[in-house]
Design a protein with these regions (language model features):
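Residues that mark the start of a beta-strand
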Residues: 130-131, 157, 302
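N-terminal ligand-binding/catalytic initiation module
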Residues: 1-110, 116-118, 125-128, 284, ...
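Adenosine-phosphate binding glycine-rich loop
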Residues: 10, 239-327
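Rossmann-like adenosine-cofactor binding region
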Residues: 187-271, 276
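NAD(P)-binding Rossmann-fold cofactor-contacting core
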Residues: 151-185
Length: 327
């Protein structure tokens, strides 16, 4: 049996950020219409904080596909000259059970997670937003910035913070313009990129904040946040992770990608357990907002949060798009 395989290089050549955003937004809408199935995540830590893996799976009936994505994070790979994030997506026919193809997982993860953060901002942030803050300088950061510029091309300033090493943020900020051009064909000549030395000041001046760290302790405090701010919380994808102060959830508009997963392993997990967020104040899943089944931002002073743990459905949709394009 000859099973098609799409490498990371082929993903980069054949998948635009516009494609990733379209695939991702379509999945959110299908999920809101009960046209998807998400199965429980399998997670295991080989060395807590340094080496772990997860397997996420799902079913897209309209595309007649099911499958899974396995991703492993191996911090020590950097010293071995290997990528620290390794993954593989397997796509199967739901009509025959036959494998349709394999796709590199890490490159697709970057694109669809970037798309998720940006779509959350598209539907919840103020339309006149000018300043954005990206908290985290890891693999995800370029994808988040590229996707955000696709849905907010009028952004004036994008600040980048590494809460544990401001030097990394400065270096990243100096390189990101060239990365956007080379990797995403995005011209960002009118955007100012800045490395952050004072996180509190940067938070207080930001309209859109995207968090993409593996933090288990809050990095952003409630008193730093100005009225009208939007958060796309992408990093908290396993139980115990927390990027923003749970007190922020006392008076916010909250949407999630998958309610069950976010309850157990998203940014809302700890606020729900602590009681700073109640179930009845979760407005719905993002697809509900996109389809007009739920109300989002009501005023320019509302603080909004999109909690995304990530779903295999997104990976499968993007992988299916690539496999069909490659036939």
């Amino acid at each position: 049996m000859n099973i098609p395989y799409i490498s990371a290089e082929e993903v980069r050549k054949n998948l635009s950020m516009e494609d990733a955003i379209q695939c991702t937004e379509n999945v959110y809408k299908l999920k809101s219409q009960d046209k998807t199935v998400v199965w429980p995540t399998i997670f295991y830590e080989f060395d807590p904080g340094h080496a772990d893996m997860d397997i996420k799976s799902g079913y897209l009936p309209e595309q007649h596909i099911f499958g899974h994505k396995m991703v492993a994070f191996m911090e020590a790979n950097v010293q071995k000259g290997l990528p620290d994030l390794v993954g593989l997506i397997a796509v199967f026919s739901s009509e025959t059970g036959m494998p349709l193809g394999l796709v590199d997982g890490s490159s697709v993860t970057g694109m669809r997670a970037g798309a998720a953060g940006a779509i959350g901002a598209k539907y919840l942030a103020r339309k006149n937003s000018q300043n954005a803050l990206i908290v985290g300088t890891g693999n995800q950061a370029p994808f988040q910035i590229a996707a955000l510029l696709k849905v907010f091309p009028t952004l004036e300033t994008i600040r980048i913070a590494n809460p544990h090493n401001e030097g990394h943020a400065a270096v990243f900020a100096s390189k990101i313009r060239a990365m956007l051009q080379t990797d995403f064909a995005i011209e960002a000549a009118s955007v100012t990129f800045e490395g952050v030395s004072d996180l509190q000041e940067a938070v207080s001046d930001s309209d859109i904040i995207i968090t993409i760290t593996p933090s288990h302790t809050p990095l952003i405090q409630k008193e730093w946040v100005k009225p009208g701010t939007h958060f796309s919380c992408i990093g908290a994808d396993m139980a115990g992770k927390e990027e923003i102060d749970s007190q922020i959830f006392e008076d916010v508009i909250v949407f999630v990608d998958d309610l069950e997963h976010c309850r157990n392993a998203g940014e809302i997990e700890i606020p729900l357990k602590q009681g700073t967020l109640s179930e009845d104040r979760i407005c719905g899943e993002l697809g509900d907002l996109i389809l007009g089944k739920a109300a989002g931002r009501k005023s320019d002073t509302d603080i909004t949060v999109f909690d995304s743990t990530g779903m295999a459905l997104l990976d499968l949709a993007v992988a299916d798009f690539l496999l069909k394009k490659n036939r």
